[in-house]
């Protein structure tokens, strides 16, 4: 019996640890401030008793997380504490400059792993190993970590990227309720026990934003579908569909209210996990539509009806066992829900097919009642296992990112906790074997490897003893003889053997192992393995059959004939698929047993863990009843002893968890030499201050040692800067030791170096920014000058093109004007032909004229319209020349020029006639002139030529014509 700290339920064996209760009472009376210790390394002295007292004090004060060096101890509160996991608290830990200085929390571990990924310190990939007994809170811890990363690792800038990140986050979080519904069950110790192991990779891109995730599962306990221990339940999903289905769905799935199913024990228990709507909504977010969901639930209902098929023993061995009368309805319903023919389903369960002889003759043998039950259970386990694997693949396809879109990952390992039940079989052996491997990983990585490395590197270190579980692992998986090898050998030999014979073989072959125990008082064949968490008795009955996990090929062929769309996808027909029966005389492939497959997958997992930086969270269960505010010291003490927590605290308090090689240390922190330049420029320095020397492979150690010393000389400067900023913890850093090949330091020293590096990088960034701004300014000026030059050239080119177009247009206009002027001259000549002949015939010929003068005069006469124009022009030829042209155009008789005088007053009045003015009244007979604009009196400005004058007059040519005419007359 267990002794309870608060005085309730005292046990008969409590005297063995009576001193613990006395120490506890003394603690409760005097050491009331012990609960304020956030790190167990500060407990003095570090013993199991003092650690236990500190944990209990913090548990009673509702403080459930405590640091133990590199490990976080998490106590299960067994009550909801919503304020402890709010998004605001997540952001507070994420935004804190030093989250390790806040209260211990699972978010501290999450933020530390996230910052390690951002720092790119090798190994960059991180892993968090959550371990503990069943019911200690491992699944809840993993769920909180996933929510934390979903909040802090998805902060893109653009709205579109934010929506994508939000969708990825929602899908990752929705994978939890689906996998818990199909993979978790209620056990004796835990209402939500994981019946499978899972390793979740949260994938991060180069900007450390979560782009996806991948889930890998290990060893689903599929036997729970058909076999549940006393006071335990089946998987949650079966209870969800029975309690949460609607009336129409109940009719469709043949699940009437209050129906009893053999594979659904304890249905009256109401658990928080029996929420059907949460599962359906999560499946919908993962891309599983409603018709597919209904198909899945229909198949699960078919499995429940399949479990109600009970057979009656046959009196004749040659006749198959017939189902009982009340099971015939279940046969019809199961066949209908699974899409199988009723008679074929019953026949495959009742009759076994045997192939024998060289010709592979087929024999049909009726099965006994026990074998019929086994084949029925095998059919159900096969369907459920395939369905679970299909769900995992759907989840991965929904949340997994492309390979080229992520570079690093953070792994979350959540496996079944250590189990010890009254009846333990192969499932418990594999589960405890996995816990032994994880414990060995912790021991090898932290307890043993660190101390051995201290000795190799030449550090002064006193070796601390610890509990090594290597003998237990040698017993389970050792070579050449171990428990697993003996069980696999029985499967390969395929010979009939009883449970007692297997027990004898194990006890005889492994008698020398200190971890193998005997229980001679037990009536059932069994053996005892002393695990790190305590001894466990395993029954050998059914051990070999479970390890074989035989699947009759006729059952697979039966499911390939199903008309159900889901089962058709789970069991596709492959004509190239090889049958399990091989012709005699040919070598058979080695039998792949359950233990072999589980061991191979576990080795792959450990390889991934070894390639990452591990972080450990130890979940502790305060009591086995799941009651809040109840702290059972015996149970907690056994868990502390099993996980080696005290040894971990000792090593963490005196050790150096940070180890960096000399080369990596110099590469990362060589910038700190800028804070103390005299170390690299003094007379004793081997290198000038111009920079680091080139490394030579032959003298690397001699090259790195002075550089490391230069970096260490900057520590006083960093300490002084930390003191100025008011950080007393960093002002007094823990010591640092330089080994032969590595530098060892504590977390506080690493934080101090990182702060100094950040300062130097900030200075370098400012220098680079200033240089970049100058360079950018010069580039902008150069580009501006180039732009101005290009613009000037373009403008010049455009101007030339414009002038060329104007010249071309002027040429076209000039030619058109010349053509038009010629037409007008011809038109005027035709109009005055008659007048010209008349004047020339009546004129006296007393004046002798030369031919040249006659031609010039004729030319002037033909231009008489110009006389009309010039008489009223404001600019042009002189007044005398103008009158001369007018006289020539009027064709007056050749005589004395003085006898014919042109009236200037009339000229000034704007009236010009080609005849002498009459002395009396006269009548004007006007007709429309063929000349355009002849009826408009021009009124030009003194300095412009407009209208008809602009078209007809060309100043230089008129002057030339009148000058020529005057010369001819002279």
Curated annotation (Swiss-Prot):
One Pfam family here: Myosin_head
Chief site of localization: mitochondrion
Compartment(s) where it occurs, according to its Swiss-Prot or TrEMBL record: Mitochondrion outer membrane; Cytoplasm, Cytoskeleton
Domain IQ residues, every copy: 759-779, 783-812
Highest taxon above the source species: Eukaryota
Effect of residue 923 to A: Does not affect localization to mitochondrion outer membrane
Keyword Glycoprotein among record annotations: no
Binding site for ATP: 132-139
GO biological process, one term: regulation of mitochondrial fission
Region named MyMOMA region: 824-970
Keywords: Actin-binding, ATP-binding, Cytoplasm, Cytoskeleton, Membrane, Mitochondrion, Mitochondrion outer membrane, Motor protein, Myosin, Nucleotide-binding, Phosphoprotein, Repeat
Segments forming domain Myosin motor: 35-758
Actin-binding as annotated region, ranges: 602-624
GO cellular component: actin cytoskeleton; cytoplasm; cytosol; membrane; mitochondrial outer membrane; mitochondrion; myosin complex
Tissue-specific expression: Widely expressed in multiple tissues and cell lines.
Domain notes: The MyMOMA (MYO19-specific mitochondrial outer membrane-association) region mediates association with the mitochondrion outer membrane via electrostatic interaction.
Similarity field: Belongs to the TRAFAC class myosin-kinesin ATPase superfamily. Myosin family.
Protein name: Unconventional myosin-XIX
Naturally occurring in which organism (per UniProt): Homo sapiens
